[in-house]
Amino acid sequence: NEKALNCEYEISAVSIHSFPKIIKDYALMNCGASMGEGYGPMLIGNSQLTAEDAKSRTIAIPGLDTSAYLALRLAWGDVDVEVLPFDEILPSVAQGKYDVGLIIHEGQLTWKDEGVCLIQDLGVWWNEKTGLPLPLGGNVVRRDLGKEICHTLAMDVKKSIEHSLQDPDTALEFAKLWGRGIDDDTNREFVQMYVNSRTIDYGEDGRSAVRLFL
């Protein structure tokens, strides 16, 4: 998100929440979406708190420009937060450094192993409220490349996603080079949650979800 603000890359993956800040410089591709289909960022606590109790606590979050934080604000309104690296939130809550944390990425699958409690799944909340998927991440391309090059790059990205879905084992092995040391089963489950047909094309309901979310 920060590098996109500085236009450092021609193509970048960003949080959907951050897109309005870069819309003058970047176009949102119709491929590369990460959307929660009835699941998403989770609020967890080191004890069994109700949502009302949790709202009064300081919440560890992965960033102010993350889609997870926007979903939290939409669901809970104005709350007290502190930003931590996303991979430090779950252990910090488990160790009692924070009462409540907002977890993303593989933490959505591993939180039960850390002895914490689920307070709310914001993907469930969003789906129940809107009937739409929760838009979390997207791919953007820099506008100064020109429409023709932007279109070509978007098509290349789409083809790469289609290829990875056709040969997921090879794609997962390649992706592990940039992984965070999670085990193969967790890695596969997480990828299957967020890389699917909607990653090839948002779909009309996916595009509607982005407009409503922002």
Show which residues each predicted segment covers.
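Short active-site-proximal "capping" loops at secondary-structure junctions
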Residues: 1, 17-21, 33-35
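Secondary-structure end/capping motifs
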Residues: 146-214
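Beta->alpha turn/N-cap motifs
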Residues: 4-20, 85-86, 103-109
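Bilobed "Venus flytrap"/periplasmic-binding protein-like clamshell domains
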Residues: 39-100, 106, 208-212
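Hydrophobic/proline-rich hinge and linker segments of small-molecule sensing/allosteric domains
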Residues: 28-50, 126-144
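A residue-level signal for conserved active-site and pocket-lining positions in enzyme catalytic cores
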Residues: 4, 72, 153
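Conserved beta-strand segments of alpha/beta enzyme cores
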Residues: 27, 80-82, 117
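Pocket-lining segment of extracytoplasmic ligand-binding domains
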Residues: 86-176
